Amino acid sequence: MANSPSAKKRAKQAEKRRSHNASLRSMVRTYIKNVVKAIAAKDLELAKTAYTAAVPVIDRMADKGIIHKNKAARHKSRLNAHIKALGEAAAA
């Protein structure tokens, strides 16, 4: 346990940051999950709408350092590839 006042303050700040970051990570996962559900349901329009809503959130969390920028890019790329494949399957 922290003994000095500054260490106590830092511990309190770290816990506050940790819980806030966990909330933000959960929000990103929810946006991604919404896109995945739309893709699984083979609903192209809903998938595109969900993806459009998810991209700025994913980018913002990457900018803030909540998730790594490469992880953000990977999620966006894979989701977009799935949506593109869904569109091609619907067209064929």
UniProtKB/Swiss-Prot annotation:
Q: Which PANTHER family match?
A: 30S RIBOSOMAL PROTEIN S20, SMALL RIBOSOMAL SUBUNIT PROTEIN BS20C
An annotated GO cellular component: cytosol
* One Pfam match: Ribosomal_S20p
UniProt protein name: Small ribosomal subunit protein bS20
By its UniProt entry, which SUPFAM superfamilies does this protein fall under? Ribosomal protein S20 (SSF46992)
Report if keyword Ribonucleoprotein is assigned. yes
Keywords recorded for this protein, A-Z? Ribonucleoprotein, Ribosomal protein, RNA-binding, rRNA-binding
Q: Which family does it belong to?
A: Belongs to the bacterial ribosomal protein bS20 family.
Picking any one GO molecular function of the record gives: small ribosomal subunit rRNA binding
